């Protein structure tokens, strides 16, 4: 019984310990609203990708490239690579650019800038 009394509070706190989700988060996880960049991605990048719309994807990637946060090396290069792939209607290349940015930069971005609008 003692062990159960110790473990249950830890289990209840575990979701708040997610490194990508600060305890004082004001956006990004339900029931909170989407964060500014998350909202923009859902409204612009996702529909264009779902429709495989090369011109809209290229435009979205160009917007991302021109709004690279200071200190995020590679952000603009990844976005420009995505824009080039979109212009070539290379959806696999587009997805690779998305994955590259998410793998390299998303975790840090979520910790440092998730609640700040970029666009």
Language model regions located:
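Extracytoplasmic c-type cytochrome modules immediately beyond a signal peptide or single-pass transmembrane anchor
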Residues: 17-100, 107-119
């Amino acid at each position: 019984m003692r062990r159960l009394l110790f473990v249950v509070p830890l289990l209840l706190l575990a979701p708040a310990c997610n490194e990508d989700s600060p305890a004082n988060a004001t956006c990004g996880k339900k029931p909170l609203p989407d964060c500014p960049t998350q909202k923009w991605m859902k409204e612009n990048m996702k529909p264009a990708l779902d429709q495989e719309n090369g011109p809209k994807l290229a435009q979205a990637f160009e917007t991302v490239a021109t709004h690279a946060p200071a200190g995020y090396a590679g952000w603009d290069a990844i976005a420009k690579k995505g824009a080039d792939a979109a212009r070539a209607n290379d959806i696999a290349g587009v997805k690779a650019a998305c994955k590259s940015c998410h793998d390299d930069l998303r975790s840090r971005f979520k910790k440092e800038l998730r609640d700040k609008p970029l666009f």
